Amino acid sequence: MSSTTPSNPSTPAPPNYAAFQTELYTSAILHGRKPTVTTDPNKLEAQARAALPLRSYNYVAGGAGERATMDANRQAFRRWALVPRMLRDTSAKKVGVELFGVKYDSPILMAPVGVQTIFHEDREVGLAKACADIGVPYIMSTAASSTIEEVGEASGSGHRWFQLYWPNTDAITRSLLSRAKTSGFSVLVVTLDTWSLAWR
């Protein structure tokens, strides 16, 4: 991670994720300042509901149909755990990954989310800029409310991937892929299991 925050060069960035956790902890305990976003994942949905217009919240939180897939995904995720190894030297921490020949400082990616104009006026452009600032690859949805070119420009030197809902028309597919390549998207993420719009 860089020693300054890219969007504000005068603001020092935490040197690593553990330091950021310590910063949040110290700020809350010593100064009574809570983080803007909750650190409890079970409270994220309630916080989003309080912050978003109802239409926006319902779109992202509702799932499809009876939410069976959404519920199953959450249950599956809960079965994963970090198992610490005791009495080991942990002074050299590495959480980075290499994907498609590129090394990233973090294993985190920004998943594709379409129609972001219903969440914030900055749309996908704003999120792409934020991802570039912190070095997280941004995956743009085919269903984005910003254009491929806008996101490409907003990303600057940041890594950007393009998610494709495969169109029925080959000419449209070629056009999307050509525009993405020209705009600096380096990885293609293909969604194959969305044959029709879900009941939302």
Regions found by a protein language model. Name each.
Residues 65-68, 118-123:
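A structural motif shared across PLP-dependent enzymes of the aminotransferase-like
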Residues 108-111, 138-140, 160-164, 188:
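Hydrophobic faces of well-ordered beta-strands that scaffold small-molecule active sites
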Residues 112-118:
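Glycine-rich phosphate/pyrophosphate-binding beta-alpha loops
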Residues 144-146, 164-168, 194:
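Short, acidic/turn-prone active-site loops that include or flank metal/cofactor-
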Residues 121-160:
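A glycine-rich phosphate/pyrophosphate-binding beta-strand-loop-alpha-helix module
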Residues 3-101:
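An N-cap/entry alpha-helix motif that binds or orients negatively charged groups
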Residues 115, 129, 153-154, 168-200:
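Alpha/beta enzyme core
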Residues 53, 110, 131, 190:
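Conserved, mostly hydrophobic/aromatic
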